[in-house]
Amino acid sequence: TKSSAASDVYKRQPEPFDYLKNKNDHNFDIELEVHLQTKEMNESCVISRTNYNYLYWNMAQQIAHHTITGCNLRTGDLLASGTISGPDKDSRGSMLEIAWGGKEPITLPNGEKRTFLEDGDVVTLKGFCKGKGYKIGFGNCIGEIKPSA
């Protein structure tokens, strides 16, 4: 439920504009994992763990900010948060951040190094909420990097 997944908002610096402040401000405690499996690996490994709560803007604020200039949202419009990165190196939310723009390669369990995704890599995104005695998963979002045509 909304109340069981709600959490305190991660500290925002600078503070949001007044029209984006809400006395009941909260975000959702949704754990997120990014898994990578290369063609050479038998199973995937976790390359990032972050949390939806690290978003600077919660979804209500994103909608308010989007629509304040008259740009309406309509049924069927897609609204997405973008990259969700946390405060630690292990919670960076994109490969660009994880490998720090290609300057800090990551070493995978089989010894391969990656600065960017390569053809044949499979990325799995997982999201879930946990409570006392239960875990609610959102399923897996899986994508494979294909060679350019």
Predicted segments with their positions:
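Residue-level preference for beta-strand/loop junctions
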Residues: K2, H26-F28
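Single conserved hydrophobic/aromatic residue that forms the stacking wall/gate
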Residues: T1-A6, Y10
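Short loop/turn segments at secondary-structure transitions that flank enzyme active sites
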Residues: S4, T38-E40, S85
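A beta-strand-loop signature enriched in Asp, Gly, Thr, and Trp
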Residues: K11-D25, L32-A80
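Short conserved beta-strand and strand-loop elements enriched in small hydrophobics
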Residues: I30-Q37, D121-G127
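Active-site pocket scaffolds in enzymes
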Residues: W57-H65, T75, L79-F128, G133-E144
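Residues that flank catalytic or metal-binding motifs in active/ligand-binding sites
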Residues: F28-I30, G139
